[in-house]
Amino acid sequence: MKVRPSVKTICDKCKIIKRKGKVMVICENPKHKQKQG
């Protein structure tokens, strides 16, 4: 999980979602997981 000021999709399978008011990227590749913080 990477915490970044701006989250971007890295590959085609990355999805941007909102969880508890936080913007997150979920993906099949665990290295692509990000959240905004």
From Swiss-Prot:
An annotated Gene Ontology molecular function: structural constituent of ribosome
Any Pfam family hit: Ribosomal_L36
Statement: the UniProt record of this protein carries the keyword Ribonucleoprotein: yes
One annotated Gene Ontology cellular component of this protein: ribonucleoprotein complex
Transmembrane segments: none
One GO BP annotation of this record: translation
InterPro entries assigned to the protein according to its UniProt record, in alphabetical order: Ribosomal_bL36, Ribosomal_bL36_sp
HAMAP family xref list: Ribosomal_bL36 (MF_00251)
NCBIfam families: rpmJ_bact (TIGR01022)
Name recorded for this polypeptide: Large ribosomal subunit protein bL36
Native organism: Heliobacterium modesticaldum (strain ATCC 51547 / Ice1)
